[in-house]
Amino acid sequence: MFPQDTLTIGGKVFTSRLMLGTGKFTDFHVMRDALEASGTQIVTVAIRRVELKAPGHVGLLDALDLSRYQLLPNTAGCRTAEEAVRVARLARAATGVNWVKLEVIPDPRWLLPDPIGTLKAAEILVGEGFTVLPYVQPDAVLARALERVGCATVMPLASPIGSGRGLRTGELLRTVLDGAGVPIVVDAGLGVPSDAAQALEAGADAVLVNTAVAEARDPVGMAQAFALGVQAGRAAFLAGRMAERTHASPSSPAAGVPCLPDPEVPV
């Protein structure tokens, strides 16, 4: 394989290209086992929607071994740039972590990110010393603008959050990947490991998955399967795919094939 192939985000080096979310799991035990099976090193948590520390019982941060994972608080549930900035600041105060997965989503039906609000919040948070990983639609112009303000990655969606519809934005993703100066992490909508493999084959640097694992019949098994899909996709990208052709091309050489008489033609 490719032992020196690593992912660098915000000055930190990772060997796994699979990020995992912590929502929707039936309990913390299943979540922990899925994280372990996935081999992930970056774990995202929704600051507005969970009890990070819960007096009298185990909270989410208590359930995570933070010596093993880079915590990535996210601003899920924030509808405006101002809300997202406020939640990011609260997350840093609560966790001591200056990483943030920036989500500004005013649309409750399709959960599509607001490009203007995202860029506005990103500029503020980068200026305050955050390592910002913004969730966006696959828009190459927006991606470059986020790079310019100092975002550590860009995270274009594959399809709507939680839909499991797979990589429906492939052509647009290619425009984001073309000339990208920061890691591109495909986020949202991936349903099965082959979706993750497809994203990595296209040149994405990593993927983030949550619902596809948490809602699987066997979340731990699916987490392991996604890890293998990511590894396969990345290995295929590095190996370089064959050129596509519009016509058939025989895999066996014609040279050296004996010229046999046509049985329909009398000798």
From Swiss-Prot:
CDD domains: ThiG (cd04728). GO terms for biological process: thiamine diphosphate biosynthetic process. InterPro entries: Aldolase_TIM, Thiazole_synthase_ThiG, ThiG. One of its GO terms (molecular function) is thiazole synthase activity. Keywords: Cytoplasm, Schiff base, Thiamine biosynthesis, Transferase. Catalyzes the rearrangement of 1-deoxy-D-xylulose 5-phosphate (DXP) to produce the thiazole phosphate moiety of thiamine. Sulfur is provided by the thiocarboxylate moiety of the carrier protein ThiS. In vitro, sulfur can be provided by H(2)S. Homotetramer. Forms heterodimers with either ThiH or ThiS. This is Thiazole synthase. It comes from Deinococcus geothermalis (strain DSM 11300 / CIP 105573 / AG-3a).
